[in-house]
Amino acid sequence: MSRVGAIATIIISLISACASAQNSVGIFENHSDVGAVLHPGSTTFDSAKNTYTVRGNGENLWASADAFQFAWKKMSGDVEITADVQFANLTGNEHKKAVLMFRQSLDADSVYADVALHASGLTSLQYRDQKGATTSEVESRVNNHGQLEFVSGPNKYPVDYTGARLKLTRRGAYVSLSIGAMGLNATYDGESIPIALTGDFYVGIGVCSHDKDVVEEANFSNVEIKNLSASAAEPVLYSTLETVAIDTTIRRVIYSDRSHFEAPNWARDGSYFLFNRNGHIEKLAVKGGTPEVLDTGTADRVNNDHGISPDASMLAISDNSQPTKSESGEETHDSLVYVLPITGGTPRRLTKKAPSYWHGWSPDGKTLAFVGQRNGDFDIYTIPVAGGEETRLTTAKGLDDGPEYSPDGRYIYFNSERTGHMQIWRMKADGSGQEQVFSDDYNNWFPHISPDGNFMVFLTYERDVTGHPGNKDVMLRLMSLGGDKMTDKKITVLAKLFGGQGTINVPSWAPDSKSLAFVSYALIPPEDAGAPAH
């Protein structure tokens, strides 16, 4: 290289370094516009107020490409970013966003996860899990202009919809959202998703105007970014009741709690959910709130196999409270199937033998389908609701589970490991014509047919997982059936989550077949969680 060329290279490097230094602001290494914007954005820092002001343009931060102003620093590993976030005003598009973000690259279609505060009051965990994929989100309960109250110790405080204390946390493969009132503690609210961020990634704050012709402004105060060391404390289990829309895959948190609950049923009129916790059935309004315990009489060890009759007058439960005898004569408390009024009351026992686990009502409400272990094998049985003897429908070696009637009553769908790993099957209601619905490299459990008969949702584990344990990386997948002949069979992913046992053991479709309910789980270090969710 000539002397002149070497000098030119040095000058260019110095200019680039100076430009980068000029773009550093506060704790952030740089700021820039991401994606296509018509009007340049900006980020400034007021050290006296410890506040960043971000002004951003951009048509959207959504779909398969983003456009926004972003202030960032590169980090790796487990990371947490926290800030008080508030819009300068609530004029303009109600979908304008102020975000805390983890982003793989500065490409417009990059993998990312963020907590997004919207001018409408919506707060959500947004994510794009593959480069160029469509963004989805988990909507927080904190919306509708801060109607939800958070609990911090003995004090309750409402969340101001114009701003909030937000925290985005990455632990291993999962990113979670915490939220609280400005200036106070942010608490885990139930939003958690797996996202693959590799090596160095970008951590920062941003604003999107959601209107390509204007620039919008938000303030980020008391911003803290830190790497997280491995927690020495025992993680806390959180259970979260969510819904997911099958057309958009948008998830919404309904209820989250620092306890273990399972298996939601969606009421036939769409107004409430039922789920089990601590041996009881609890009822929760579809809008959330505080659950109420349903009276189930002497059945006080109800497990996660329960469901509402087609006419909404009765509830079938599986319960372990009564003494039973095993086939070898040992005293046990194995599961039995009962029915009781939907409003609560004394349960009436149906199955004579144990263990028995309810899974389906016939459309006419006259027959129950259940799983029973007899002579060492788990098979599918039916029994009249009025009482009578059980009828065995399957005889194949290996576990058969999860029987559920199709809405027209012609078929019973179930899962079976008769081929070597768990797959979805169906048979005619009398047990004849058993056929495998599809086969793939996963283990698939608990088929649930939509009320309109057009779709089937099911729980998917990785191939190497045995049984249906809890606390695993799982998927909810959706198959389009295309009628009784199953001419479509297109499968899509509705949600990726931490769960398994308890997530979707029983029917949980909304009456309109547009969404369904499920339970996700999270193991959160106490120092990440803040105060308990309620």
Which stretches of residues belong to each language-model region?
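Bacterial N-terminal signal peptides
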Residues: I7-A17
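Acidic/proline-rich low-complexity IDRs
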Residues: S13, Q147, G183, P194-A196, ...
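Generic detector of low-complexity/intrinsically disordered segments
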Residues: S16, S124-Y127, F150, L168, ...
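Extracellular glycan-recognition regions
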Residues: Q22-S231
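N-terminal compositionally biased, intrinsically disordered segments and leader/signal-like regions
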Residues: I10, T135, Y188, T249-I250
